[in-house]
Amino acid sequence: MLPLVTSGSVERLRPAARTVLLTAVAMLAFATNSLLCRLALRDAQIDAASSGSLRLVSGALMLAIVVRAGAGRPPPRADWLAAAMLFAYVACFSFAYLSVNAATRAPILFGAVQLTMFAAGLHAGERFTAPGWVGMAAAVAGLLYLVSPGVSAPTPGGVVLMSAAGVAWGVYSLRGRGLADPLAATAGNFLLAAPMALALSAVFAGRFHPTTRGALLAVASGALTSGIGYVVWYAALKHLAAMRAAAVQLSVPPIAACGAVLFLAERPTWRLAIASAAILGGIALVLASRAHGKTAPQAQRPPDTR
């Protein structure tokens, strides 16, 4: 279960502590999302197109309810690029999941995310100090060590789809930096992306085979770990430089692996413990090091008053 973080309790924290808390909750949401997708797609409980549609539609409905409950909240300005990237990420990830195994999936997906967000950060003038680069190298090495036993050559189509998912997620994350109202922005993105997913489902109607369990897992993923989780991520991004935001996402695979041990009865291993220590220790080193250049989120994109 995701911890309950209310806006009032978060606002009372110091800025640095608030950013750490929001980032930690977002990473937990992403890891939980990974487990829900694994349960639904791995066992063929639902087809890829239906999974994506249910995730985006349920997320849009959940966020519409939350936004409507907020008094005096102005309607969000349409961000079609962010919505398109959200749809592309969900669709490409769902289809690639069926053709790329778990061990190969993580390096491709997170590699594409890192390259996209690092390129944007470097272009904006962000730079790591030497300890930051050491921490990043340790985190990447830990990820590769975690997944190395099961790495195999994926299909070319799977590589393209998973890489596209990573790039789309990187761009979607970058669009969230500097937003004044993460909730309204995320709600608007889901609202615009949902019809795209429904159109894709219509194209693949012949493969339609959701079970009740698969549909419930997709709805839980969309309404909670995607919808609410992405709001928390956008809130955290207000205070994270692009390169640091990229680095912290490397924590998702070990968190998901630990969740599988706790909730899916998978066996803990020394490999998981060592890799998790390397990844989390490396990320801590990245966050503790001072960055050179433009590190403010607004350096990449002008402040948005949405």
Explain the meaning of each model-derived region:
Residues 50-61, 86, 94-127, 165, ...:
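Specific alpha-helical transmembrane segments that line the substrate/conduction pathway
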Residues 1-53, 84, 88-92, 141, ...:
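Glycine-/small-residue-enriched transmembrane alpha-helix faces in small-molecule transporters
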Residues 2, 44-88, 112-120, 168-172, ...:
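Transmembrane alpha-helices of multi-pass small-molecule transport proteins
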Residues 29, 70-110, 118, 138-145, ...:
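Specific transmembrane alpha-helical segments of multi-pass solute transporters/efflux pumps
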Residues 105-112, 175-194, 226-262:
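Helix-helix packing/entry segments at the starts of transmembrane helices
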Residues 15-20, 44-53, 74-76, 133, ...:
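Juxtamembrane helix-entry segments on the extracytoplasmic side of multipass membrane proteins
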Residues 2-12, 56, 250-306:
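C-terminal-most transmembrane helix of multi-pass membrane proteins
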Residues 63, 86, 128-148, 165, ...:
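Hydrophobic transmembrane alpha-helices of multi-pass small-molecule transport proteins
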